[in-house]
Curated annotation (Swiss-Prot):
Domain of life assignment: Archaea
PANTHER family tied to this protein: 2-HYDROXYACID DEHYDROGENASE-RELATED, GLYOXYLATE_HYDROXYPYRUVATE REDUCTASE B
PROSITE patterns: D_2_HYDROXYACID_DH_1, D_2_HYDROXYACID_DH_3
Catalytic activity: glycolate + NAD(+) = glyoxylate + NADH + H(+)
Leading EC class: oxidoreductase
A molecular-function term among this protein's GO annotations: glyoxylate reductase (NADH) activity
Subunit structure: Homodimer.
Record-listed E.C. numbers: 1.1.1.26
Protein name per UniProt: Glyoxylate reductase
Keywords for this protein: Cytoplasm, NAD, Oxidoreductase
Annotated Pfam families: 2-Hacid_dh, 2-Hacid_dh_C
Binding-site residues for NADP(+), renumbered to this chain: 159-162, 181-183, 240-242, 289-291
């Protein structure tokens, strides 16, 4: 009996590919750039499984071109790039990679927070460019004055795995921890000494606001002009969630006009992204969507992708199935 075919839309760590090759016929798109839409639509015609990145839109058009497709494994914790409702109707399983990238993303959130608060990027440029040497001044009491982090108030919007991991790091800085999520989490509140606050109250009280929510209809442009104006003028906004959670035009206005002190961004409304108006500001720290970019996290994601596909092939429910309603439509397996 021939092996089921899986197409992977980008090179993932070898550990995941090696696991899959034992059970599947594997094809990988090896170009650094994302796969062109027309090629993706051609590749899916005869595949049984698909491994996708956030950059690929997996929608009805893709499903219609893929009559054999039974499972889509997203190489990410988020899955807003996939039409999950349409997949479920067609009996197509959708999985993601939660858990394995939690700590890496939380680490980056704090890296952005510290870098923004303490002007690390500006200081690096000042030193590296030779400007420090040109000034001929070893130290000045008013250079690069930033904001204290220790003992301040952090407001975390979204209190799932990543939000809670950020809170754990905040405890090390003896911060007051506020959080907002759709549901209160009394046990976690007790464990992390965290306080639940309505969103607008959290924004008004926090020195640092960190976004860790999934993108959906409720969170799209959650941080808009009205809410940015609620924040302290000394507050710093960090986004490791999804770019579209923030209204970018409103954020630029806030940074320019001093409604808030600064921002640290890892995600953007469109990716890859360039915005001269935003990028010219010196009170924003920018990274190119690298929240999960550690060796350990990316290998863990690759393993979890493989584990999901292998479990499905064996007729088992994948460990991180997103659309559990699909179990009513089709049993797991390539039968």
């Amino acid at each position: 009996m021939s092996k089921p075919r899986v197409f992977i839309t980008r090179e993932i760590p070898e550990v995941g590919i090696e696991m899959l090759e034992k059970e599947f016929e594997v094809e990988v798109w090896e170009d650094e750039r994302e796969i062109p839409r027309e090629i993706l639509l051609e590749k899916v015609k005869d595949v049984d499984a698909l491994v996708t990145m956030l950059s690929e839109r997996i929608d009805r058009e893709v499903f219609e071109r893929a009559p054999r497709l039974r499972i889509v494994a997203n190489y990410a914790v988020g899955y807003d790039n996939i039409d999950v409702e349409e997949a479920t109707k067609r009996g197509i399983y959708v999985t993601n990679t939660p858990g394995v990238l939690t700590d890496a993303t939380a680490d980056l959130a704090f890296a952005l927070l510290l870098a923004t608060a303490r002007h690390l990027v500006k200081g690096d440029k000042f030193t590296r460019s030779g400007e420090w040497k040109k000034r001929g001044v070893a130290w000045h009491p008013k250079w690069f004055l930033g904001y204290d982090v220790y003992g301040k108030t952090i407001g975390i919007i979204g209190f799932g795995r990543i939000g809670q991991a950020i809170a754990k790091r905040a405890r090390g800085f003896d911060m007051r921890i506020l959080y907002y999520s759709r549901t209160r989490k009394p046990e976690v509140e007790k464990e992390l000494n965290a306080e639940f606050k309505p969103l607008d109250e959290l924004l008004r009280e926090s020195d640092f606001v960190v976004l860790a929510v999934p993108l959906n209809k409720e969170t799209y442009h959650m941080i808009n002009e009205e809410r940015l104006k609620m924040m302290k003028r000394t507050a710093i906004l960090i986004n490791v969630a999804r770019g579209k959670v923030i209204d970018t035009k409103a954020l630029i206005k806030a940074l320019k006009e001093g409604w808030i002190a600064g921002a640290g961004l890892d995600v953007y409304e469109e990716e890859p992204y360039y915005n001269e108006e935003l990028f010219s500001l010196d009170n924003v720290v920018l990274t190119p969507h690298i929240g999960s970019a550690t060796f350990g996290a990316r290998e863990g994601m690759a393993k979890l992708v493989a584990e999901n596909l292998i479990a499905f092939k064996r007729g088992e429910v994948p460990p991180t199935l997103v659309n559990r309603e699909v179990l009513k439509v089709r049993k797991p397996g390539f039968q």
